[in-house]
Amino acid sequence: MANHVSSLKRARQTVRKTAVNRANKSRVRGSLRSLREAIQKGDVKAAQEQYKATASALDKSVQKGILHANTASRYKSRLNARVKALATQAA
């Protein structure tokens, strides 16, 4: 356990920041899950709408330092390819 005043403060800050980071990461994972479920169901319109929300959540997570920019870009690229494939398959 921390003994110095500064280390006690850092411990408190870590607890708060961990909670915020966990909530943000959970939000991104939930958005990804919703998009994958929409793709799995084959609902093109829902998948396209959910992709917009997911891309936004990924971009926000990059700004907050939750994900690396390349990781978010990779997710968006792969998910967009799946949504486009679903749209062309349905058409």
From Swiss-Prot:
Gene Ontology MF terms in the entry: small ribosomal subunit rRNA binding; structural constituent of ribosome
Annotated keywords: Ribonucleoprotein, Ribosomal protein, RNA-binding, rRNA-binding
Family (UniProt): Belongs to the bacterial ribosomal protein bS20 family.
Protein name, as recorded: Small ribosomal subunit protein bS20
Region (Disordered): 1-31
Organism taxonomic ancestry: Bacteria, Pseudomonadati, Acidobacteriota, Terriglobia, Terriglobales
Pfam family, one: Ribosomal_S20p
Record InterPro entries: Ribosomal_bS20, Ribosomal_bS20_sf
Keyword field contains rRNA-binding: yes
UniProt GO cellular component terms: cytosol; small ribosomal subunit
